[in-house]
């Protein structure tokens, strides 16, 4: 709703909205033909602010002590392992589908309306694992990370092994930033990019972002646009493989 409003808002230099990848590419791809709403390309990228990789986690009480143990059980017992996500066809679900593709395991997805519901479900034993954003994991107590979808060890939780080192070349993450209506004035774009770059370089700001479980990741509008295109192609490939789009 907010992103549809944003693309129709006045491009006066003052209307700005927060955006979240991969959701701004997933929603238009999956929307039924003719249904109104925004298109990804209508959102003018202003800047990327944070990087938040995907991670597979279990409760500390879980019998699964490693990624390998969980995957082997899920392969031997298709559908028996219940996996939380923050909703069908979200970034969490894309991550789950890719883990299934790379490993041959089969999970039963249990979608929740957000991390505030999925996390208690994991800790309370409603589900066996949670395909999550790392920021959610870092704000939790009582959870154990089994594998993170980054190429190299992630500085905010360096003890969690990467998918890459476990033998699966899978990188999956959310990016969050700012966008504006289309036809945004170039002068306003340049001014805001410079001001936001200064804010994002401030040590106090960076400490606050890390304290929220996120990695500061400022990129200007051009670079953020390239990330959006990259994520669009990755999402399209996964959705096609799953038979969800043509």
Question: Residue ranges of each PLM-predicted region?
Answer:
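Short helices/loops that flank or line small-molecule/ion binding pockets
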Residues: 1-11, 74, 97-102, 116-130, ...
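Hinge/capping helix and adjacent helix->loop/strand transition within the periplasmic-binding protein
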Residues: 5-16, 28-114, 163, 168, ...
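Non-transmembrane alpha-helical segments in soluble domains
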Residues: 7, 68-71, 119, 123, ...
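Short beta-strand and adjacent tight-turn residues that come in two discontinuous sequence segments
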Residues: 16-19, 112, 131-133, 148, ...
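A ligand-binding cleft/hinge motif common to bilobed small-molecule-binding domains
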Residues: 22-34, 98-102, 124, 129-158
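Residue-level signal for the nucleotide or nucleotide-sugar donor/cofactor binding architecture
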Residues: 65, 117, 158, 183-188, ...
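An extracytoplasmic/periplasmic, membrane-proximal ligand-sensing/linker region
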Residues: 101-105, 186-246
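Glycine-rich "substrate-gating" loop/helix at the edge of Rossmann-like oxidoreductase active sites
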Residues: 112-117, 153
